[in-house]
């Protein structure tokens, strides 16, 4: 690609994030580095991974280079944006007409960086080399990525950044002064009416007052920040750093304004009301509603869909609705214009361009911002009509109705008849939240009943709630696929819609995590119609279309839950986990699924691996055996069971072409206290198989006696196996503590999430050969 400016001080010449413009084919990846090294183009970066670092730390795990002929005379510094493993040091070497320029970075921490290599007056770059050095004792199973390479002029950058940092809190032409006295009444009544607000205030008073509400803590987070100091040309995708600039890390404009707006009208706090309006003005003054230049690079069609625009639209519409009295007419109309142009323009383009949006979560994902903005525009457009008569019907309304039709089309495609959903419980509860809040707003605007607008297919997900509702004390649901947490408002809507389902169980556990009060005004409003507890679990609950099931039995008054993971052909956002299982007992997850983590953390890719699940995996030197993902085959457990017994089998070789020629997994349990898992297997290639069992609980291994004990708080599990099995307990690296601080930037996630530890305990049982049977017997007992 050509050297392309991204602002007045910087330009890029290597767009690794664009699959067409990426220059990866011009790079040479040198051998002699890490074991199992792979470098491949992905949808938003070039990804590298390896299985084991070089034994000699002076040998780069990854070395790649290319030649080029680039005029750099207008710039002073080379920039390289990449993600490297924690502790890694990265060397950049540039060949120029004035000699070689070289730098070695300081050790990487937890986030991606933009490395700067001074060019020392050079005017032409002729070659580039990247080298990544790591400590072989720490770096096993590594994933990282390369984003882009560019040039920078330091003096011009300072001038450019001064231009961006021009805002203060006065907003004289746009907002009412601090002396203004608000009425704390909604402008449009779409989110809540004045009467509903009064009921919410009474509920807060009954629950201990404002400081007892989790919304108070979220509002205090908003109050601690200065939105004007976080305003740039772009808007970060929450605290996600995958696509933003390093200098914009921590500039978290989204969500805080919406939280401040809700807290303002709930607690009658005028400073929070004006603060919410300031957040909205900062969003309105951001040049582009995207995390960085990636979506707006001249000559490049890569874009990150409508994720950030839809979030900005929602925040701005909510703030206009709840705190609209704080805006001047001019300030309000500025936001309305951005909603119509930047917001709806991007959403409509995405809807027309990308058909896949209707076959996954994303049409619904974008919908609350799209719908709320349309409804606010309905109430305010036309902004000018004199000297002509104002239209009797809104010209916006047909577009609003089209948006609702898009939502219904999307839900009809993604909700399965057995109540399943392929992308896991976090994606589903967020999708359900987006869908139901969209129907909620539309119903209020049209004078309809919200429940009557919600598609019947959503009600079938009561089955999913029962299959995935966790009996572990620290979990609301079993976090399969890319799940990190269960969005509370989504659980609230589902419990409100299906008060006789286990969505009530999930929502009530979520509210308990937030001190007995929900985090948002809507959830507080819905809670009044949700029962105090959910129903009892049924002994066997199956979802044959998606290939998942759960067995529920009791041992001494404590639940024993066994969940089996299958597959619907082509299912997306899933992991390499078909045939995996989760075992819960006495309030703990003895065999666990660790779900996912922040997508800015390469660990999110590692957690998809079959080696991180309760799986049987082939072993082979120098490679990581893995199944296809997605797998284009239905994998469904065949099961029978009651309050006492359970038996299931799965045929699992599909997706493992080139590895397994036979893999049948059986679960047999004559009583809730005992379980035998038997794998009957044969390989096309490899040295044998390893049975992985992973949990957060401590594992004590007695290899001599072929036994491992997993200790819970109220129960224990004893695992035994036959002769000829090699056993080892490992502590796999998991999430560094710094990521807890990152998550705290989004309290709506942090307050209900089950946090990862620094390590993932894993029992590995290896059986050598090309075929065999591996049986693991489990005995459960109460302490």
What are these regions (language model features)?
Residues 48-124, 133, 139-145:
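Extracellular ligand-binding interfaces
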Residues 422-783:
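Extended polysaccharide-engagement surfaces of secreted carbohydrate-active enzymes
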């Amino acid at each position: 690609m050509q050297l392309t400016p991204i602002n007045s001080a910087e330009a890029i010449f290597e767009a690794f994030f664009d699959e067409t413009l990426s220059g990866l084919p011009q790079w040479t990846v040198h051998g002699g580095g890490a074991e199992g090294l792979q470098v491949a183009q992905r949808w938003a970066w070039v990804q590298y991974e390896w299985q084991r670092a070089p034994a000699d730390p002076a040998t780069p795990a990854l070395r790649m280079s290319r030649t080029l002929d680039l005029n750099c005379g207008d710039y002073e510094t080379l920039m390289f944006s990449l993600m490297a493993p924690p502790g890694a040091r990265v060397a950049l070497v540039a060949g120029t007409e004035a000699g070689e320029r070289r730098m070695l970075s300081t050790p990487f921490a937890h986030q991606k960086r933009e490395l700067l290599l001074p060019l020392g007056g050079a005017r032409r770059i002729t070659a580039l080399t990247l080298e990544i050095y790591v400590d072989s004792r720490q770096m096993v199973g590594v994933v990282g990525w390369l984003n882009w390479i560019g040039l920078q002029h330091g003096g011009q950058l300072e001038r450019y950044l001064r231009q961006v940092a021009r805002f203060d809190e006065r907003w004289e032409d746009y907002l009412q002064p601090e002396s203004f006295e608000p009425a704390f009444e909604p402008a449009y009544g779409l989110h809540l009416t004045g009467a509903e607000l009064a009921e919410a205030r009474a509920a807060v008073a009954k629950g201990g007052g404002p400081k007892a509400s989790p919304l108070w803590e979220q509002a205090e987070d908003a109050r601690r920040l200065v939105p004007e100091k976080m305003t740039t040309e772009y808007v970060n995708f929450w605290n996600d750093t995958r696509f933003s600039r390093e200098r914009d890390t921590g500039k978290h404009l989204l969500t805080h304004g919406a939280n401040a707006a809700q807290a303002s009208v709930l607690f009658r706090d005028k400073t929070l009301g004006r603060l919410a309006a300031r957040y909205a003005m900062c969003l309105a003054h951001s040049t582009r509603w995207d995390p960085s230049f990636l979506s707006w690079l001249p000559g490049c069609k890569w874009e990150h869909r409508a994720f950030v625009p839809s979030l900005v639209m929602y925040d701005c519409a909510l703030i206009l609705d709840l705190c609209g009295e704080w805006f001047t007419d001019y300030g309000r109309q500025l936001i309305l214009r951005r909603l119509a142009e930047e917001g709806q323009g991007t959403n409509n383009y995405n809807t027309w361009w990308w058909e896949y949006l209707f076959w996954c979560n994303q049409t619904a994902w974008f919908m609350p911002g799209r719908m709320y903005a349309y409804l606010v525009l309905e109430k305010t457009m036309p902004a000018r009509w004199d000297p002509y008569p104002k239209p009797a019907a809104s010209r916006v309304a047909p577009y609003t109705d089209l948006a609702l039709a898009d939502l219904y089309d999307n839900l009809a495609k993604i909700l399965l008849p057995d109540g399943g959903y392929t992308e896991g419980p976090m994606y589903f509860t967020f999708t359900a939240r987006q869908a139901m809040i969209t129907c909620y707003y539309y119903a209020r605007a049209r004078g309809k009943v919200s429940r009557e607008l919600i598609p019947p297919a959503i009600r079938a997900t009561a089955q999913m709630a029962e299959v995935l509702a966790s009996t572990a004390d620290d979990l609301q649901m079993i976090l399969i696929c890319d799940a990190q947490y269960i969005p509370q408002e989504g659980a609230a809507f589902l419990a409100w819609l299906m008060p006789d389902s286990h969505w009530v169980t999930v929502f009530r556990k979520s509210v308990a995590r937030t001190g007995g009060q929900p985090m948002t005004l809507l959830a507080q409003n819905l809670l009044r119609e949700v029962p105090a507890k959910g129903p009892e679990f049924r002994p066997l609950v199956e979802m044959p279309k998606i290939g998942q099931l759960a067995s529920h039995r009791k041992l001494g008054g404590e639940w024993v839950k066994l969940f089996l993971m299958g597959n619907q052909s082509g299912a997306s956002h899933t992991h390499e986990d078909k045939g995996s299982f989760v075992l819960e007992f006495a309030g703990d997850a003895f065999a666990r699924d660790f779900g996912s983590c922040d997508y800015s953390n390469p660990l999110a890719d590692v957690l998809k691996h079959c080696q991180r699940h309760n799986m049987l995996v082939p072993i082979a030197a120098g490679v990581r055996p893995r199944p296809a993902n997605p797998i284009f085959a239905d994998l469904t457990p065949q099961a029978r069971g009651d309050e006492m017994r359970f038996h299931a089998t799965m045929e699992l070789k599909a997706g493992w072409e080139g590895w397994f020629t036979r893999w049948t997994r059986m679960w047999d349990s004559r009583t809730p206290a005992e379980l035998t898992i038997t794998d009957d297997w044969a390989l096309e290639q490899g040295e044998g198989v390893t049975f992985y069992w992973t949990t957060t609980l401590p594992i004590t291994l007695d290899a001599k006696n072929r036994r491992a004990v997993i200790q819970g708080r109220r129960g224990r599990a004893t695992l035994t196996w036959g002769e000829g099995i090699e056993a080892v307990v490992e502590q796999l690296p998991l999430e560094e503590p710094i990521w807890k601080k990152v998550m705290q930037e989004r309290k709506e996630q942090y307050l209900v999430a089950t946090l990862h530890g620094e390590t993932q305990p894993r029992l590995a049982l290896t059986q050598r050969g090309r075929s065999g049977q591996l049986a693991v017997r489990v005995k459960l007992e109460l302490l």
